[in-house]
Regions:
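Active-site hotspot residues in diverse enzymes, especially metal/ion-binding acidic/histidine motifs
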Residues: 1-217
């Protein structure tokens, strides 16, 4: 039984539902609100995924921000990537790897190896780009997109965005920046998510923001 699932198309609404249900499950078991500084780490802990920081050499595509070792239930974060000093980039990266764990890893197969002493089974020894979050996302395959979309839904579920929107004008960058900080994401993450939901329209040449057809009142 392979640890890595073969690629298959997953509708966006299904990815969003899976991510939202996971977020709600984590929140329901806590007395305190999730901190924007550690949302993804807390969810990883809930899933019993360990996080380790160490250097990861670049490959032929470019820098690798992180990778996941399924049979070790471990996310490796590249300690040499300076962008991790920014909380939003760190949260997005960890959430991305969680997306791979949920969407692309056969967890039943992982359980068969979990008690073994082997470091990593053969299928994981070979480089698997979709298990690594490359900084150069423009080169990412479809499974990378799925994991990143999952990450956006996990960190910015619609019900959290509705809360964060209160008292803010989403057509003003000066309101979006603190909103992104409150959510624990980058401004780019937030812009992409709001555009995808149809809440805003952004003129990329002028950076002017307009209300989208689905923007909540």
């Amino acid at each position: 039984m392979d640890v890595i699932k073969p690629y298959k198309f997953i509708p966006k609404d299904r990815i969003e539902r899976i991510a939202t249900e996971l977020r709600q499950k984590v929140e329901s078991g806590r007395k305190r609100r999730l901190s924007a500084e550690s949302i993804a780490e807390t969810i990883a802990d809930f899933l019993e995924l360990n996080i380790m920081w160490e250097g990861i050499p670049a490959d032929n595509i470019g820098k690798i921000a992180a990778m996941i070792f399924p049979t070790k239930q471990m996310i490796i974060i590249n300690s040499n990537v300076s962008e991790f000093e920014k909380n939003g980039f760190r949260q997005s990266t960890i959430a991305h790897e969680i997306g791979h764990w949920i969407l692309h890893i056969n967890q039943q197969a992982v359980e068969k190896y979990i008690d073994r002493d082997d470091s990593i089974i053969e299928i994981v020894k070979q480089p698997q780009l979709f298990l690594c979050r490359s900084i150069q996302q423009s080169l990412a395959p479809k499974i990378e997109w799925q994991a990143q979309y999952f990450a956006g839904c996990l960190l910015m579920p619609e019900y959290k965005l509705i809360d964060a929107k209160r008292g803010r004008d989403l057509t003003q960058w000066k309101h979006l920046y603190p909103m992104a900080e409150d959510l624990g994401v980058t401004i780019s993450n937030l812009k992409v998510r709001l555009k995808d939901l149809g809440w805003i329209i952004v003129n990329d040449s002028t950076r002017q923001i307009y209300p989208g057809r689905n923007m909540p009142k």
